[in-house]
């Protein structure tokens, strides 16, 4: 373990990268609050940021617009920093239906959700890392602006153990219970502990493969050991260890009882308001629901929907922002916002949608007004909490450019020498026939084609038409979930089909080097899908191929088209000039075709369990394909496999248990996307 970032990479910065890295680092160290990295597709933006992180040596939070991109970034940073703490913080819900009320039909929808335990463990690991290590890099989505337990409570509850320390066993058990760990003498699972004489085994909630053994003698801690909870194998001995709470929302018994009192006061005030407005049904509903929750909290310290009382549990004033992941960041941290033109508008939108739903619940007596404070951060609150930031995008929005005040660092020249695709404009009248002839040319070369249309109906009709003419074509639409979307892109790269048709094929950040042609139908129809940024992003999908070309079908030149073409020409000019000056011959990007989550798969446990196997053993083992499974199926399969694994371990069949653990690891990784 080290407290310094150590970048591991087989190559060194090239093209525009060295100058960009130097400028970003100099601006950061000069105290510049906001700056923008404008990097074209395939210019190595992630590698550039990794170099910046290594040079500034600050804890880093990287925000991505969706789970798919966050997973890809997590895998890439994990490979760049194998000796450091690279963590993953996204929503842990596989499925989430928030509670809501529809007044027009008098329908109340109960909250329903399914939590992914593996992602919950990774979230806990992320916050622990931020609080305990300087070499921490966390990749997150907008989940980072949603309410979390206060870091002060999280830290005050932790259990610090040292060899030689005097501690009463009953006191130790009580402290673990306060951390919401459960006692289980039969099997040691994550977030549980067991007692055997003067030996306590604890499986930390944020750990995936290591458990802690505390050996006491006459009230003193004699030995602290990390061991494999599955096989019992000793991993290493420790002098000191800190056990963190099982959940971010853990709190003391005193704080819970204090919250019960303040909730009662708020309930009394709210009921008086409702009675004064003659809202008798709402008052009765609120009293009944809240009293039930209060009884649960007083008896067991928890209730369904306890997050709606988070203001009382954290001691915040009405209207104050909730604690979030940003409260866990040290003040000197670095914030990187990837694909900022998408991520920043998302941050602003989260609060408004949440607020309107909650106001209805409060108005009709389903929740107390304090439930409104269980919310994501407002945009201005997020701005106030953000440390020094780098916005990363091929098409930065007006907000990023304004905030950066002209500090825009360009990554236009690619290390591979590739230049931006040639952009051609052709008439709309014969666009489908012209497109078909272009597709046939590309198929002969073994390349792939992306086609983007304006409407779902047009995409469906075009897919059907191309299919009838013998072209292997697929259609990407909004009903396809994230995992299946990634699979379709992977199949396109593998050559299982040649043409992918869709409405919005920007898919920022996804690599498809085999695509040499991007066709944009009806490019002259101004709007969101044909804005300057959208056109540049879509054209960029062909930028990783030596034969890259973009065809815009249009009968007139719009301002967006002109701006996109001008920017593309400017970049090409700079790239060609650089290549001639340095004698560089452009080469297509060679990227192995693998699962987008591959980088995240290769954690220590999987590497360790795979090292000692013979080839014959690997062939004989069944390796099921989990990628096509839906989240609910994955959750069910996980539970079934875990039960089998623990049963094998209980029967001392450690080899069989280890094999199942490998399957679980693959399955958990499949669920990340």
Swiss-Prot record:
A motif (Beta-hairpin) lies at residues 92-115. The keyword Transmembrane does not apply. SUPFAM superfamilies: C-terminal UvrC-binding domain of UvrB, P-loop containing nucleoside triphosphate hydrolases. Residues 26-183 form the Helicase ATP-binding domain. Residues 618-630 have a biased composition (Basic and acidic residues). Residues 431-597 form the Helicase C-terminal domain. One of its GO terms (biological process) is SOS response. It is found in: Cytoplasm. GO terms for cellular component: cytoplasm; excinuclease repair complex. GO terms for molecular function: ATP binding; ATP hydrolysis activity; DNA binding; excinuclease ABC activity; helicase activity. Residues 601-631 are annotated as: Disordered. Keywords: ATP-binding, Cytoplasm, DNA damage, DNA excision, DNA repair, Excision nuclease, Helicase, Hydrolase, Nucleotide-binding, SOS response. ATP binds at residues 39-46. It comes from the Bacteria. Residues 635-670 form the UVR domain. Its main location: cytoplasm. The keyword ATP-binding applies. It holds the Pfam family UvrB_inter. The beta-hairpin motif is involved in DNA binding. Forms a heterotetramer with UvrA during the search for lesions. Interacts with UvrC in an incision complex. Belongs to the UvrB family. The UvrABC repair system catalyzes the recognition and processing of DNA lesions. A damage recognition complex composed of 2 UvrA and 2 UvrB subunits scans DNA for abnormalities. Upon binding of the UvrA(2)B(2) complex to a putative damaged site, the DNA wraps around one UvrB monomer. DNA wrap is dependent on ATP binding by UvrB and probably causes local melting of the DNA helix, facilitating insertion of UvrB beta-hairpin between the DNA strands. Then UvrB probes one DNA strand for the presence of a lesion. This is UvrABC system protein B. It comes from Xanthomonas oryzae pv. oryzae (strain MAFF 311018).
């Amino acid at each position: 373990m080290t407290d310094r970032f150590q970048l591991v990479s087989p190559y060194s910065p090239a093209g525009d990268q060295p100058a960009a890295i130097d400028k970003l680092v100099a601006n950061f160290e000069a105290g510049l609050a906001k700056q923008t990295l404008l990097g074209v597709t395939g210019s190595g933006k992630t590698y550039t940021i990794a170099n910046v992180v290594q040079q500034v040596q600050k804890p880093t939070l990287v925000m991505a617009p969706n789970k798919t991109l966050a997973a890809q970034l997590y895998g890439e940073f994990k490979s760049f920093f194998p000796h450091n703490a690279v963590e993953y913080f996204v929503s842990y819900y596989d499925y989430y239906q928030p509670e809501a009320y529809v007044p027009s039909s008098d329908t109340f929808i109960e909250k329903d959700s399914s939590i992914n335990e593996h992602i919950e463990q990774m979230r806990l690991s992320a916050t622990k890392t931020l609080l305990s290590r300087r070499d921490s890099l966390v990749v997150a989505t907008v989940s980072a602006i949603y309410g979390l337990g206060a870091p002060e409570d999280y830290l005050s509850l932790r259990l610090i153990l040292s060899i030689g320390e005097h501690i009463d066993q009953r006191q130790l058990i009580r402290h673990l219970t306060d951390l919401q760990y459960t006692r289980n003498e039969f099997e040691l699972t994550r977030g549980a502990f067991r007692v055997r004489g003067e030996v306590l085994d604890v499986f930390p909630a944020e750990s995936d493969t290591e458990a802690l053994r505390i050996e006491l003698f006459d009230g003193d801690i004699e030995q602290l050991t990390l061991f494999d909870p599955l096989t019992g194998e000793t991993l290493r001995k420790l002098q000191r260890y800190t056990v963190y709470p099982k959940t971010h929302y853990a709190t003391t018994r005193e704080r819970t009882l204090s919250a019960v009192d303040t909730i009662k006061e708020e309930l009394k005030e709210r009921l008086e308001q409702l009675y004064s407005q003659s809202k008798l049904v709402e008052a009765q509903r609120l009293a009944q629901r809240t009293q039930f929750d209060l009884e649960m909290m007083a008896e067991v310290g928890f209730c369904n929907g306890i997050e709606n009382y988070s203001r009382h549990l954290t001691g915040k004033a009405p209207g104050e922002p909730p604690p979030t992941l940003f409260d866990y960041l040290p003040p000197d941290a670095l914030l990187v916002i990837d694909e900022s033109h998408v991520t920043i508008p998302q941050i602003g939108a989260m609060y408004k949608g949440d607020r309107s739903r909650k106001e209805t619940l409060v108005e009709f007596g389903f929740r107390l007004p304090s439930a409104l404070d269980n919310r994501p951060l407002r945009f201005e609150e997020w701005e106030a909490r953000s440390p020094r930031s780098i916005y990363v995008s091929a098409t930065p929005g007006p907000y990023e450019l304004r905030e950066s005040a002209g500090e825009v660092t360009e990554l236009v020249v690619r290390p591979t020498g590739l230049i931006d695709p040639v952009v051609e404009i052709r008439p709309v009248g014969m666009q489908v026939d012209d497109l078909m002839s272009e597709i046939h040319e590309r198929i002969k070369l073994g390349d792939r084609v992306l086609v983007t249309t304006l409407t779902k109906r047009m995409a469906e009709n075009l897919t059907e038409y191309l299919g009838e003419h013998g072209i292997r074509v697929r259609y990407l639409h909004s009903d396809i979930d994230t995992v299946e979307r990634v699979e379709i892109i992977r199949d396109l790269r593998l050559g299982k089909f040649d043409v992918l048709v869709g409405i919005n094929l920007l898919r920022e950040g996804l690599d498809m080097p085999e695509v040499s042609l991007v066709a944009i139908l009806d490019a002259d129809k101004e709007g969101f899908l044909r804005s300057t940024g959208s056109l540049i992003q879509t054209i960029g999908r062909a930028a990783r191929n030596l034969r890259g070309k973009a065809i815009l079908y249009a009968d007139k030149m719009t301002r967006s088209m002109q701006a996109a073409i001008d920017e593309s020409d400017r970049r090409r000019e700079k790239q060609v000039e650089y290549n001639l000056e340095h004698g560089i011959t452009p080469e297509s990007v060679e990227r192995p075709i693998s699962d987008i989550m591959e980088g995240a798969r290769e954690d220590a446990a999987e590497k360790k369990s795979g090292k000692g196997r013979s080839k014959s053993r690997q062939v004989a083992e069944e390796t099921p394909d989990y990628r096509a499974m839906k989240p609910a199926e994955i959750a069910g399969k996980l539970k079934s496999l875990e039960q089998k694994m623990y049963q094998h371990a209980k029967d001392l069949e450690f080899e069989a248990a280890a094999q199942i653990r490998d399957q679980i690891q693959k399955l958990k990784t499949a669920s990340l996307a």
